[in-house]
A protein has these predicted regions:
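Gram-negative bacterial Sec-dependent N-terminal signal peptides
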Residues: 2-23
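N-terminal charge/polar-biased segments
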Residues: 24-25, 270
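Solvent-exposed N-terminal domain segments of exported/luminal and surface proteins
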Residues: 28, 33-259
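Short, His- and charge-rich active-site/binding loops that engage polyanionic ligands
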Residues: 267-268, 273-281
Length: 281
């Protein structure tokens, strides 16, 4: 019986893909709802039925008043530092909330009686700068998918499809959700095993999206910016066995006519090599 489901799933996926290709762009009138009836990225502005997701109230843009942030390397301030949790889930009451907990979270309560989850109110208080709003609104009426799901066309930065109509748009939204021009972060963490052993992993990570360059006027597309939507550089800082390894990746916006470019540097051999095995996971 399980094999009989495959044609149905395949047929449904085909219909969804076809629907997405047929309705990639929206009207000027519908795009005008972005920032008014909708969040600038397309989400509903109002609260959901039970109030667990509140209304979007764009009262802040950037650093909220009264808070200090010295910049990269410093801890970001918490605008809700005085807020108290509305619920504390413990090993004693977690089964009452099982429908909202993953299997892993439930297992933690079983194994570690002192484990707790503090639940705070959801907030939607931050706004989006006007340049990004205009880019996303422009995309809504101009950007489209072609060549199945492989090619993004007439894109000018920001989220590609704020009002998606099918699966291809949702896929491209995952690739264009970050609206920064450049991004730099150092990931540093430990994986802790059940026996208490720890695995240290640290990466210095840079990413650039040339389409989000503020110097590009709204409506500047791949015809000017070029065929690559994201550039990524990473360097391994830990563990010691991989320290110094570097990776550079270029992601195209047209996967039909351009491949992902990737190179790695191995400090052991002091060689740079193409890395076709770096895939899309």
């Amino acid at each position: 019986m399980r094999y009989a489901k495959r044609p149905v799933v395949t047929a449904l996926a085909s219909v969804l893909l076809a629907a997405g290709l047929a309705h990639a762009k929206v009207s000027e009138e519908e795009a005008a709802t972005l920032g008014t009836e909708r969040h600038p990225f397309g989400a509903e502005k109002g609260a959901n039925a039970d109030g667990s997701i509140p209304e979007w109230t764009p009262k802040w843009l950037g650093l909220p008043p009264g808070l200090d942030y010295a910049g990269p390397g410093e801890t970001r301030p918490n605008p809700y530092a005085d807020e108290k949790p509305i619920l504390v889930i413990t090993a004693q009451n977690y089964k009452e909330h099982a429908e909202n907990l993953s299997e892993g979270q439930q297992a933690l309560f079983e194994r570690y009686p002192e484990y707790r989850i503090l639940v705070y109110p959801t907030r939607r208080d931050f706004d989006v700068n006007e340049r990004i709003k205009e880019r996303v609104k422009w995309n809504a009426v101009h950007t489209e998918v072609s060549n199945g799901v492989e090619t993004l066309k007439n894109y000018n930065g920001g989220m590609a499809f704020p009002i998606p109509t099918g699966v291809p748009e949702l896929m491209w939204n995952m690739r264009t959700a970050n609206c920064y021009e450049s991004y730099h972060v150092a990931y540093d963490g430990y994986g802790v095993f059940a026996n208490g052993e720890r695995a240290h992993d640290a990466v210095d990570f840079w990413q650039s999206n040339p389409f989000n360059n503020p110097a590009n006027p709204v409506g500047t597309t791949e015809a000017v910016v070029g065929d690559y939507i994201v550039w990524t550089f990473s360097e391994r800082l830990a563990p010691q066995s991989t320290k110094g390894q570097m990776t550079v990746v270029q992601d195209p916006m047209d996967f039909k006519n351009h491949k992902r470019n990737a190179w790695t540097y191995d400090p052991g051999t002091r060689r740079v090599r193409k890395a076709p095995a770096i895939g899309y996971d």
